[in-house]
Amino acid sequence: MRSKLVLYILSAFSVFSCKSEEQKKEEATPLHTRGEITLQYDDSFVNIAEALSQRYVKVYPNAKINLKVSKEDQALEDLLNHKVDMIIMSRELTEKERKYWDAKTKLPWQPSYFAADAVCFVVNKNSEKQHVSLEEIKEMLKSGAKKLIFDGANTSNLNAVLQKLNLDLKDVKYSRLEGNENIIESLEKFSNHIGVVSYNTISRPYGERATELRENIKILPIKVGDSLFLPNKENLKTQKYPLTKLLYFLTDEGTFGVANGLIRYSCTDIGQKIVSREGLQPYNLYPRTINIIHK
């Protein structure tokens, strides 16, 4: 009986020691390499969000990033209410939103910019229309003809256009379809309409889906004075394209966990190369140094 008691005590001590060692090992593992978070973002940012998060979890397989698509304004609301861990935004917060951020998070508002995207105006490939101007866009929104197709209110694309043209949501009229890809596909049916989509939806140079979408549309350059500007990397870099959008992360994570790890990964060299491969303009430019050795 006594020997059984001793054996039980030794077994319990062994299990306790193993658990302690496992706990110590886990505690020694950096927080940004393990754990689970939810990243929420507008439909406009699907491709870049997937590319960055998928690469991150390949580097850190013990990290899990759940992806959630919503309207841009809904993503901000969910972050402020602690329903998600981080979001992608393309517009600046209003003064009221900044005050709410300060009250809800107790953290400084610190946007982490990582890419330049754009709002694109696209038509069916057979359309005779060659370009569009900001003045024309404003007139179409106010006319009631609903020739512009957006992906709904409170979305990144509509937010950017309204902000640029200094218009209020209640004063504009437009057609609506859910999803940037759906808008592009609908232009074959609605040949007299103009689709308003994110550049990121079609920017992947060699992406099979992006290529398929590009083949059926024509991107309208925006006319400014006598110049025409397309949403290409150079015009996004200089922001000469009038509807350039700067994408950034926001998180209320108070430690250097998976959320802040993803931010650092996305904003430094490797992440910026991924941004470039997605066809977007990297926000942070890393100069390449070439050492020439004279013999």
Role assignments for model-derived ranges:
Residues 1-16:
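Sec-dependent bacterial lipoprotein signal peptides
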Residues 41-42, 71-75, 82, 261:
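Glycine-centered small-residue hotspots that permit tight backbone geometry or close packing
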Residues 73-104:
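Pocket-flanking alpha-helical
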